Amino acid sequence: MMKNKPNVRYLALGALLILVWLTQWIPALATIYSQTIYPLISYVLSFFSGLFPFAIGDLFIFLSIAGVIIYPIYARLRKKLPWKKVLLRDGEYLLWIYVWFYLAWGLNYSQKNFYQRTEIPYTAYTPENFQEFVDDYITQLNRSYTPVNSINQDLIREETVRIYNQLSDSLGVHRPPHDHPRVKTMLFTPFISMVGVTGSMGPFFCEFTLNGDLLPANYPATYAHELAHLLGITSEAEANFYAYQVCTRSQAMGIRFSGYFSVLGHVLGNAKRLLSEEEYAKLFQRIRPEIIELAKNNQAYWAAKYSPVVGAVQDWIYDLYLKGNKIESGRQNYSEVVGLLISYQEWKKMN
């Protein structure tokens, strides 16, 4: 399978593993990777993956999982290889995958966070700043409402790329590597819908994918969120923040509404936790009935596709994955977008 001399191959693998670990441990190396090396990697890999009309990352992951499972059976039963040799080969393959993942994208987990990159100070929640944020948010959400019944992929791509280019310097995010990034539809959309995932970043080939079942109102913000991951953003909260900033700055009404609508669940979740029942009820009543109806329909739509058993397993695995990559809050990281929005709002008032 691998024709290099084993000792040379093992030396190369060992050297790359050490490089990955050093970059994770030394902040200066992580900065060099995220600011200088990764943009070049993403340019090359996203160009390559863009040559294919399907998600090659999804196919690669599927074939890798299948190979890791099937190879030991084949090697043991047909080739009569000893278990030790079989498992060592499987283990070596997984280590190469580990190295590829981190060198191609995963080392961005070790970069500076949003506050460090932008020098925008973190602002802690207070009853005053949270209430101010929520009042302004609901006002803008209601104003932005427009029925979204179709998906204009060209417009969404053009607007998202244009605004990311505008925000890049001020908000600490890379510019898109290409003017026409090619989004892919997830290969296994029915299964992905069963676990409630709407999009993903394919790290091995720097391609971002969207669930084929996405509804029109969700599509623009999800596109901007997953593109943020392609731009090196690993935090889910930060990706939500950038998607919000990009979409709400668009002149296209459907895209702008999608941006505001994308964080509604996170805002209400924080409000329910921080406000009294009476305050929360008043806040909820301020939201336009059409938006509440849309949110309920969205929830019912995804609930009908969701599998509690499969979804629970995926949630557990993804939570471990995030925590293992310096996202200490795990899946709760998504809702931390509200803290980023409040900090940004307070910073803008002083600048």
Which residues fall in each region the model found?
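Transmembrane alpha-helices and immediately adjacent membrane-cytoplasm interface residues
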Residues: 69-73, 80-116
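Auxiliary, metal-adjacent structural segments of Zn-dependent hydrolase domains
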Residues: 147-208, 212, 216
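Active-site recognition of the HExxH zinc-binding catalytic motif
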Residues: 53, 219-245
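Post-HExxH zinc-binding segment in Zn-dependent metallohydrolases
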Residues: 130-138, 234-277
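Alpha-helical transmembrane signal-anchor/signal-peptide segments
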Residues: 30-35, 106-129
